[in-house]
Amino acid sequence: METYDIAIIGTGSGNSILDERYASKRAAICEQGTFGGTCLNVGCIPTKMFVYAAEVAKTIRGASRYGIDAHIDRVRWDDVVSRVFGRIDPIALSGEDYRRCAPNIDVYRTHTRFGPVQADGRYLLRTDAGEEFTAEQVVIAAGSRPVIPPAILASGVDYHTSDTVMRIAELPEHIVIVGSGFIAAEFAHVFSALGVRVTLVIRGSCLLRHCDDTICERFTRIASTKWELRTHRNVVDGQQRGSGVALRLDDGCTINADLLLVATGRVSNADLLDAEQAGVDVEDGRVIVDEYQRTSARGVFALGDVSSPYLLKHVANHEARVVQHNLLCDWEDTQSMIVTDHRYVPAAVFTDPQIAAVGLTENQAVAKGLDISVKIQDYGDVAYGWAMEDTSGIVKLITERGSGRLLGAHIMGYQASSLIQPLIQAMSFGLTAAEMARGQYWIHPALPEVVENALLGLR
């Protein structure tokens, strides 16, 4: 039986752990899917490449507003797809080749799960191909998978998820998206901008319900002018109609469409690992970790979607850096270890308009009993926003009265994911709203002035 110093399950952020410090250690890397994980292959990177194409199309369609006549002759979907995966697929292949060429690394390309802990304390790992090996330390970085509602599964109807929809052979005329979160909002934007009719089936009353209420309500209102929203509805059955689908909703209505995209969230892969055999605790579907990313089993760490509630690549990367350091420390030597910092975890939704957030929502701040000040600033109130003729972009800031401490920032509009970065920095380094507003120059007439004005408007 093969024996290793370290085994890593998953090649997303977990694949970044083995650097030159591990050259003397024998390692196993286990990956059942495409090398590189969700972000590289079916998540952050390809989706943003599709979003960029959508932004180009949207800009062309809106050009007449600025005195420029332009139109789209056609969308060459094959070329859109080829541009994306012609660049991404070679990265996955070269990443696997790089690991296979390392003299101290073996790659296992099937699903891997835990077996019983060995008498010497080493962890037994088993692959679906029948291979068995042991490791002294294990990193669980097995990621997550899409959630499919039971009614859709039971119906037997054809569906896509974010894992598959970017490789469809041709653009549909009409797509139905079941879901209301980040993934649903981004793909609604992509397909709509490329000329596809979009219908969203939403269980609640609004899109992006995890966002601050102001953002959620305004975004849903904007979305309703572009996409058909079926709110307070669930799919109860479905049928295949030729190459399309017919979905029956709980109000008795039927929606006919060419393609169904299920975007109802993702779930940790912790339940697929037989983690209990290794003494690894799993709660609410996720591997439990402490601030050092240690699990309940000595020598076993976890990171990313399999253990984190955030399901964000930048969080997984941060946790991977923590694990990378702590693997080289004695298990009990927490003085030498570093801890994860999840105080201010930002997120962005690359939809239209773009959305970004960090910290508390207004409702969360109120629920904590904090005395708060809130300011909402329109993009159109500053020179660059006025030049753009922007009528929907906003910056919403929440601070604690008295201390001026920034509690939350929520932005909807052009380049929201970039505009929010200095606010993340201010929160991380303890700057007050006043210090941030008056302690630096703000370039005029640049769009970040909307952040400056929001800061100055706080009382």
Swiss-Prot record:
Binds 1 FAD per subunit. PROSITE patterns: PYRIDINE_REDOX_1. It comes from Mycobacterium tuberculosis (strain ATCC 25618 / H37Rv). The keyword NAD applies. Disulfide bonds join 39-44. The lineage of its organism: Bacteria, Bacillati, Actinomycetota, Actinomycetes, Mycobacteriales. GO terms for molecular function: dihydrolipoyl dehydrogenase (NADH) activity; flavin adenine dinucleotide binding; mycothione reductase [NAD(P)H] activity; NADPH binding. Its cofactor is FAD. Its EC number is 1.8.1.15. Pfam families: Pyr_redox_2, Pyr_redox_dim. One of its GO terms (cellular component) is cytosol. Coiled coil: none annotated. FAD binds at residues 31-39. Belongs to the class-I pyridine nucleotide-disulfide oxidoreductase family. Optimum pH is 7-9. It catalyses: 2 mycothiol + NADP(+) = mycothione + NADPH + H(+); 2 mycothiol + NAD(+) = mycothione + NADH + H(+). One of its GO terms (biological process) is 2-oxoglutarate metabolic process. This is Mycothione reductase. InterPro entries: Class-I_Pyr_Nuc-Dis_Oxidored (IPR050151), FAD/NAD-bd_sf (IPR036188), FAD/NAD-binding_dom (IPR023753), FAD/NAD-linked_Rdtase_dimer_sf (IPR016156), Mycothione_reductase (IPR017817), Pyr_nuc-diS_OxRdtase (IPR001100), Pyr_nucl-diS_OxRdtase_dimer (IPR004099), Pyr_OxRdtase_I_AS (IPR012999). It comes from the Bacteria. Gene3D superfamilies: 3.30.390.30, FAD/NAD(P)-binding domain (3.50.50.60). SUPFAM superfamilies: FAD/NAD(P)-binding domain, FAD/NAD-linked reductases, dimerisation (C-terminal) domain.
